């Protein structure tokens, strides 16, 4: 049986997040629903228990103040992966610092690629559909008139669980508020 993976995300429950969720459904209607989010720690196995990971999150995030990020332009990770995303402009260095601080102890993991603060729009099956999705997403995002600023104050620790015999469902485990300790579990 495959080990579950864990991640730390900041959900976007605002007009920008709704825009991305609607765009994702349009670009790839077969994908299961995935809430719009910024990834602080990409998926990884734990180097210990869930409890020890939550303790690390509580300790480190409790000492971090909430901060604002601004969403930038639509970009793609092609040819590395067929992923279309919105780059984080202002606040990206703060996200990177938080990522580095949290990549320790039970959450420590050598990631395959360098950490790039971003909001994933969609991951396609291959490069050609990703390029098409990129063009469409870039055009739509240029016409988005809502706020591109996001206050990061609450993060969510999630686990990939099995549904229909495959690891493909992310479950919220704990909510962590920056500047304070764990809120719920």
Question: Would you name each region that the model predicts?
Answer:
Residues 1-185:
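Histidine-dependent nucleotide/RNA phosphoesterase domain, centered on the 2H-phosphoesterase fold
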């Amino acid at each position: 049986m495959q080990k579950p993976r864990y991640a730390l995300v900041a959900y976007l429950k605002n007009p920008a997040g709704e825009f991305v969720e609607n765009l994702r459904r349009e670009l790839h209607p077969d994908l299961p629903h995935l809430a719009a989010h910024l990834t602080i720690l990409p998926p990884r196995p734990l180097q210990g228990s869930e409890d020890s990971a939550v303790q690390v999150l509580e300790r480190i995030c409790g000492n971090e103040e909430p901060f604002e990020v601004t969403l930038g332009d639509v970009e793609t990770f092609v040819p590395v992966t067929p992923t279309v995303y919105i780059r984080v402009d202002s606040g990206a260095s703060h996200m990177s610092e938080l990522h580095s601080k949290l990549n320790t102890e039970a959450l420590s993991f050598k990631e395959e690629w360098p950490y790039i603060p971003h909001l994933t729009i969609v991951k396609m099956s291959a490069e050609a559909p990703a390029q098409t999705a990129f063009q469409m997403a870039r055009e739509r995002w240029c016409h988005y008139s809502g706020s591109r600023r996001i206050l990061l104050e609450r993060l969510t620790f999630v686990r990939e669980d099995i549904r229909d015999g495959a690891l493909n469902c992310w479950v919220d485990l704990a909510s962590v508020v920056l500047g304070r300790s764990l809120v719920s579990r």
